[in-house]
Amino acid sequence: MSSTAQKNSLSPTGNGVTKRKSGSAACVHCHRRKVRCDARIVGLPCSNCRSSGKTDCRIHEKKKRLAVRSILNPVPIRCRPPSTSEHVPEASPPSTISEPTAFTTAFRGVQPEAAAPPASVAPNVQSKAQHLHSNSYSQTSPQAQECHLPPASDRFAEQDAHADFEKRLVKLIDDEEGSGPREIQRGVRAIYVGHELSNMSFLIRQQRDKDDDVYHFAGSEIPRRQLKTGHDQLLVDALTLPEPALVDELVQAYFTHVNPGYPIVEEDQFMSQYRNRDPSDPPPILLLQAILLVGCHVTHPKEERDALKAIFFRRAKWLFDNRIERNRDTLVQAALLLTWHSDSPDDDVSANAHYWVGVAARIATGLGMHRNPVSSRFAPRDRRMWRRLWYILVQLDVMVSLSYGRPQAINLEDSDVSPLTASDFEGCGARVQTDYVIHFSELCTMISYIVRERFGLRVSSERRKAALQEADEALANWSLRLPDHLRLRASDMDPWSAMLHLTYNNFLILLHRPHPRASAYSDDYGPHDAEICSAAAGVITSIFEELRLNDRLKYLWYSGVHTLFTAMIQVRVELRFSNPVLAINALRRFDSASCSLRELAKYWSHATTILRLFEDSKRLQKDLRLATSERSRPFSSTQDQPQAQALDQNKNQHQHSSADAPVQPPQPDRLLPSYDSPTPDSTSLPQTAVSPHQNLTFDSWIPSTNLATVDPMDQPREFLDWRQLFSFTDPDQPVLPMSMDGLPELEDEWRQIYWQETPMSDLLQDGGWMHG
């Protein structure tokens, strides 16, 4: 053993002399856990890896840090000298050369001569742009690759780090001391798991029963990255555009598939500037680079799309950070567009949609977009644009807040912006989805108030109960007021209606699912929570399946991944039902959701981490096998054997009846009856004393000018008919995409599966949710 340790501690040098390495080196596992390692003494594997049964023990090697050069002394870029044997291209006409130069100069302070690259650099930039958008990436010369590609060792290290980031969901509690919080040391990222509404907090607290008051956990080491582009080339790179044909394609794709539902840019004005090619009035280069990024997201295949988006994002971010664009309205627009970029999965705090929504909110409130511009001196076109941008910002802020369980960047109590009207969309093109934007703004505004009243840190328990009752009533009323073309339908689902109902049903699950051990909300559940959550999860998986079959998943925004994550957690619980019919039905929905998540991973990097979470779950694989066969043992404990036998008998009868005759849909007169608040016993619910500000229902926060009139609702009854929360165009169409027979009898079982420690612990058995 000592000889082995001696061999491992010695390393040959270039002159044949062995040199003893430092004894402080540790293996990769001990280095990640920040514990002492004795690999240099006892050899490999070390004592810690032997005790934990790890077989891949190896010495951790530090990454070599590249020498950081001064800005005044950049790394010289070697370019291939022109060869006499190669064909020399003919000189382009003067109009062809001057047009892109003037077009890319989006600000008056830089003259076309200053914006144009030097003579020695121009051929390289032009060839890079042409090569980038060709289908073949192998035509680049070795010299050009040497100019733009990092060393092979750095590329391999970056690939390994990227693979570790993708598996970070299964590494948080891999250590023996993973049952408790690990010290957050210097150089290690702190992970905020969000409040009780987030899926991260849900899974973590279901696994860690002693960490109710812990919201920050230790993550991975902070990565070190080097600047790959020379400082003297950043301006030239940021002002560079691809070939005109590709620019036309991406701009058209953006205004066809994205801007109609998120009218951030006034299409008529922008396209007029874009087509005229007027050097004195060009479109903002920052806005154009951001539009190219979003257009690339919805058009090109993955390999080419990732490369193009990285380049467009680098250019747009450099222009944004260096304040090349002086119009703050354009900065808000660009920040909202940059939320479509899927940055590296190692950071969703200072990158990705959460970061850019916060940046847009800061600039917008600094400009005063949250106040109603009543001054007559305000240009009508700018007033319309401000109102659109403000409500789109509210939408994205609410969706990203639900995704991560983080506070909203916008407090609507500080805003008095008037509701959106059809006139606010003037100049946004013929394809603009006016009704969708208006109703989606109403939904997100309502969700914002519900979250604050229901999940606020300083909200009393009485107010929480009242907020849940008001939330269900307001959501049902909003659903009933939807126009026919926005209502939920079984087929031909367009991306706008899909995003509307995905956000709606995602919030239904977050509002009604039991919290782990139900700490602060133990008495806030209702008699139909199981049906509401199961129906909402079924709607979500059906919408994703419809979009996947029609190749429309690419049109969904960032939050679509987390919406599917919420539904898969609900379906994951249903896989453990003792009723085999419900379990097998859940298995089909889980398979469909997994396929949709795998497809979303092609567009959003954080979908890959969630996919790995479910694919690497050991207990999940066991439940998937059990779901394919009849379960002879019900969920009840051994002391409830009479009830278990009765449940088995009822289960067999239900199975035979379902095999003989199809399941009948609910009768039309049962679709939309009146309802009461979803509480365990509405007759005994105490009357809560609320402040004058709190006695308003959530309907009062929806702009009344945009709501269609509906018949008054009946008087409250004892229980809520939860089917009013799900609206369809066809009144004869079944409300649910699946049979709900047998689920009401399993309400307690459903709640216990959510509360118990085992069902979700396998998702974190090899690790946990890690963002940061």
From Swiss-Prot:
InterPro entries: Amide_Lactam_Regulators (IPR052073), Transcription_factor_dom_fun (IPR007219), Zn2-C6_fun-type_DNA-bd_sf (IPR036864), Zn2Cys6_DnaBD (IPR001138). Residues 1-16, 124-144, 634-658 have a biased composition (Polar residues). GO terms for biological process: DNA-templated transcription; fatty acid catabolic process; positive regulation of transcription by RNA polymerase II. One of its GO terms (cellular component) is nucleus. Its main location: nucleus. Residues 1-23, 78-99, 114-148, 627-690 are annotated as: Disordered. This is Acetamidase regulatory protein. It comes from Aspergillus fumigatus (strain ATCC MYA-4609 / CBS 101355 / FGSC A1100 / Af293) (Neosartorya fumigata). The lineage of its organism: Eukaryota, Fungi, Dikarya, Ascomycota, Pezizomycotina. The gene is amdR.
